[in-house]
Amino acid sequence: MDEVKYPVLTEKSIRLLERNQYTFNVDSQLNKTKMKIWIEHFFDVKVIAMNSYRLPEKGGKGGSMIGHPIRCKRMIITLKPGDSIPLFSEQ
């Protein structure tokens, strides 16, 4: 799926892994419903909650560019206890 760019590994996202929450950067046009269906189908897990937010915009450097470039969206996905995404397993 091209809309899911990559998993995020920051201090906050690593801390959230302990609470069974996974963080992904996704395309700015992707909505929660499509993401939930994709995660449940691809990883065979049960999603119980999703939070999303847009990353802060970066200012332009002048020139012919007007406004700000569209950046990606970040989604935090909470899974049912006992489920996990294999990308982050320690095996």
UniProtKB/Swiss-Prot annotation:
Superkingdom as given in the UniProt entry: Eukaryota
SUPFAM superfamilies given in the database record: Ribosomal proteins S24e, L23 and L15e
Sections of the chain in a coiled coil: none
Compartments in which it is found: Plastid, Chloroplast
InterPro entries recorded: Nucleotide-bd_a/b_plait_sf, Ribosomal_uL23-like, Ribosomal_uL23/eL15/eS24_sf, Ribosomal_uL23_CS
Keywords recorded for this protein, A-Z: Chloroplast, Plastid, Ribonucleoprotein, Ribosomal protein, RNA-binding, rRNA-binding
Example GO biological process: translation
Single Gene Ontology MF annotation: structural constituent of ribosome
Family, per entry: Belongs to the universal ribosomal protein uL23 family.
Subunit structure and binding partners: Part of the 50S ribosomal subunit.
Protein name: Large ribosomal subunit protein uL23c
Organism in which the protein naturally occurs: Picea abies
Gene: rpl23
